[in-house]
From Swiss-Prot:
This is Uncharacterized protein YEL014C. GO terms for cellular component: cytoplasm. It comes from Saccharomyces cerevisiae (strain ATCC 204508 / S288c). It is found in: Cytoplasm. Its main location: cytoplasm. Keywords: Cytoplasm.
Amino acid sequence: MTALFCLELRTNIFLIMNDCIIINYWKGFIFSFHSYFFPFRFESSLRAHYPGKRNYSDFSVIPLPYYIDVRSFHICESQHIIALPLQIPLPYRMLIRMYPV
C-alpha cells in the first residue's frame, strides 16, 4: 500500500489554497496535504468530485511537480502521516495525511 501510494503522489495532486489542504483520491482514499507556503494561485472547483463531503466551491488549486523522490518519504504509521523531506523546494514541503473514504 505504501509503495503504490508514494508512486501515485507523482501525478495529479492539487492544493486547495483557501484552507491549506491538498486533496486527491486514489483507490478509495482521500489524501489531505498541509503545506507551509504557496506562491501560486489557480481557481478550480472540486464539488463534482466529492459530493456531500464538504463545500468544495471556489477553491484555489496548484498542481504539484512529479520529480519528488519518493524514497525520501518518512512514514508515521500510527498517525497515517507522510512527511516530505526538507530538501524539497519550499512550496512543496508537505505533511500528507490519508483518509479512508
